């Protein structure tokens, strides 16, 4: 009994510490082994996670996005950190729109293509194609590389001006103008895309021909696995 009484204060203190522990201390519990929060590896990265909100081609939050954060495989995050360091030395910073994407989000895209069009959203994101044709055109897929955890959608920021570089089209503008090598943009816009592309490739990423913002780690650690844990903090 005396031993139990002596231990009680310590038990109380431990319980109190667990109750008062900041939510951020438990953050890693939501990330499977082999994955990291991008901001933990690249604190300077700006996040604009579009599928958490409504500023995306669906016009609403997408399933599986429970927080406006970015998650990647450890290998992809480390490679992206090298990209960021290189670009920062040139006066630029990276801005991330999407990284790991759960399979449930991809399934949500499939469901969305079967619904009615919102003319306002269509004019902003896919004005020249029917939503039902987005899969056939290569803009959407039933299995996304994002779900493997080593694909990232991003752009460049001018650190001094605090503005995005002009890439000739905005993120998720599902149109040929967003393709690498598009003749529909200016030389300056092409140069901005090339700066991002050459730097990403320098550190082991490969581009996607139809989308200037889309890059995948060439030696990705999970080439055949598609994950479905939520994007959460």
List each language-model region with its residue ranges.
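Short, low-complexity intrinsically disordered segments
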Residues: 6, 210-211
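Bacterial N-terminal signal peptides that target proteins for export
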Residues: 2-12
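Conserved metal-phosphate-binding beta-hairpin within the catalytic cores
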Residues: 215
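Intrinsically disordered, low-complexity segments enriched in polar/charged small residues
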Residues: 12-13, 219
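Extracytoplasmic cell-surface/polysaccharide-interacting catalytic and binding patches
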Residues: 25-99, 104-107, 111-210, 219-233
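Bacterial N-terminal signal peptides
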Residues: 13-22
């Amino acid at each position: 009994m005396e031993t139990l009484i002596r231990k009680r204060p310590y038990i109380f203190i431990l319980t109190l510490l667990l109750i008062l522990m900041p939510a951020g201390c438990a953050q890693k519990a939501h990330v499977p082994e082999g994955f990291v929060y991008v901001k933990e590896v690249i604190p300077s990265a700006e996040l604009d996670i579009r599928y958490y909100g409504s500023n995306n081609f669906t016009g609403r939050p997408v399933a599986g996005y429970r927080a406006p954060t970015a998650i990647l495989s450890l290998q992809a995050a480390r490679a992206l950190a090298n990209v960021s360091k290189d670009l920062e030395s040139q006066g630029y910073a990276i801005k991330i729109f999407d990284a790991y994407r759960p399979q449930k989000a991809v399934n949500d895209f499939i469901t969305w293509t079967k619904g009615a069009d919102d003319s306002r959203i269509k004019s902003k994101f896919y004005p020249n194609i029917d939503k039902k044709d987005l899969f056939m055109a290569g803009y959407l897929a039933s299995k996304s590389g994002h779900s493997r955890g080593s694909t990232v959608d991003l752009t460049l920021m001018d650190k001094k001006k605090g503005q995005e570089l002009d890439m000739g089209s905005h993120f998720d503008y599902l149109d040929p103008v967003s393709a690498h090598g598009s003749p529909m943009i200016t030389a300056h816009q092409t140069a901005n895309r090339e700066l991002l592309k050459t730097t990403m490739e320098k550190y082991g990423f490969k581009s996607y021909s139809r989308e200037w913002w889309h890059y995948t780690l060439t030696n990705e650690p999970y080439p055949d696995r598609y994950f479905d844990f939520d994007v959460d903090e």
